[in-house]
């Protein structure tokens, strides 16, 4: 019998959650991570599944995700503990045939349930599936320190925030030319913040929750993690710049245009126009 804890997706979740905790992005039970799988990914591990999988209804049906398996982090679980006990802190779930709920096939032992931000994740998965023709498979939420700090001092406007991050590090425009979506402050763990996040995910692979954290999307765990890591690095540079009195020179609009042309990306027009 193959052990699901040795599968590429469980091992990938262990690495991503451990790395995020080591970065300081996921204190206590902060942060959550979901990865969309295929039936072929989980097929070799049926012998590991719960004999009687628990069923949990969704707060709203999501027919686009019908019959789709995911691996998810658990509610109230600490990222630092995923590596110690994957089955207690992670779960493989599968949405039912009409998208009205899901079964917990593996993990989330001791009656644990998926992250409270599952509505935001599933709604964002729906939008990224449509926006990327199914390419994006990962939604990651974390409390990236410097990105949060900037939401207190920068105007919380997509164009302004995006332009500052692009200027903070040359690679940013190449990595997220679609810019950073920004919500108003909202209560977490609700359908309302999930819907607002998903709406921004139609246009952006990164979405900031001011004074709280960031959502990132990507085709793989590495890509989603790297996207947030790149934005957070630029935010760290900007925090240092502002603490030293501000910019005396920066990457110009013309240079940003040249950068986009060199790497074949189309920068967010509103940010480029500033």
Curated annotation (Swiss-Prot):
It is an enzyme of class 4 (lyase). GO terms for molecular function: metal ion binding; rhamnulose-1-phosphate aldolase activity. GO terms for biological process: pentose catabolic process; rhamnose catabolic process. Its cofactor is Zn(2+). Signal peptide: none annotated. SUPFAM superfamilies: AraD/HMP-PK domain-like (SSF53639). Binds 1 zinc ion per subunit. InterPro entries: Aldolase_class_II_sugar_metab, Aldolase_II/adducin_N, Aldolase_II/adducin_N_sf, Rhamnulose-1-P_Aldolase. It comes from the Bacteria. Its EC number is 4.1.2.19. Pathway: Carbohydrate degradation; L-rhamnose degradation; glycerone phosphate from L-rhamnose: step 3/3. HAMAP family: RhaD. Catalyzes the reversible cleavage of L-rhamnulose-1-phosphate to dihydroxyacetone phosphate (DHAP) and L-lactaldehyde. This is Rhamnulose-1-phosphate aldolase. It comes from Escherichia fergusonii (strain ATCC 35469 / DSM 13698 / CCUG 18766 / IAM 14443 / JCM 21226 / LMG 7866 / NBRC 102419 / NCTC 12128 / CDC 0568-73). The lineage of its organism: Bacteria, Pseudomonadati, Pseudomonadota, Gammaproteobacteria, Enterobacterales. The gene is rhaD.
């Amino acid at each position: 019998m193959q052990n699901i804890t040795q599968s590429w997706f469980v091992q990938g979740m262990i690495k991503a959650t451990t790395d995020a905790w080591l970065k300081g992005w996921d204190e206590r039970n902060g942060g959550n991570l979901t990865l969309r799988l295929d039936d072929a990914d989980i097929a070799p591990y049926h012998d590991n599944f719960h004999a009687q999988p628990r069923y949990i209804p969704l707060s709203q049906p999501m027919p686009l995700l019908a019959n789709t398996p995911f691996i998810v982090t658990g509610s109230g679980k600490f990222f630092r503990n995923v590596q110690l006990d994957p089955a207690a802190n992670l779960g493989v779930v599968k949405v039912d045939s009409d998208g009205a709920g899901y079964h917990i096939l593996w993990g989330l032992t001791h009656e644990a349930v998926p992250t409270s931000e599952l509505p935001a994740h599933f709604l964002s998965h729906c939008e990224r599936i449509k926006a990327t023709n199914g390419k994006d498979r990962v939604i990651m939420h974390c409390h990236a320190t410097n990105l949060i700090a900037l939401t207190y001092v920068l105007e919380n406007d997509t164009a302004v925030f995006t332009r500052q991050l692009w200027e903070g590090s040359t690679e940013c425009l190449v990595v997220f030319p679609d810019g950073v979506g920004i919500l108003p402050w909202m209560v977490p763990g609700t359908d309302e913040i999930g819907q607002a996040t998903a709406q921004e995910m139609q246009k952006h692979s990164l979405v900031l929750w001011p004074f709280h954290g960031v959502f990132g999307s990507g085709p793989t765990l590495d890509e989603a993690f790297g996207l947030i890591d790149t934005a957070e690095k630029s935010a760290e540079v900007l925090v240092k710049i502002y603490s030293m009195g501000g910019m005396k020179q920066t990457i110009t609009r013309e240079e940003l245009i040249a950068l986009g042309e060199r790497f074949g990306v189309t920068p967010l027009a509103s940010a480029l126009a500033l």
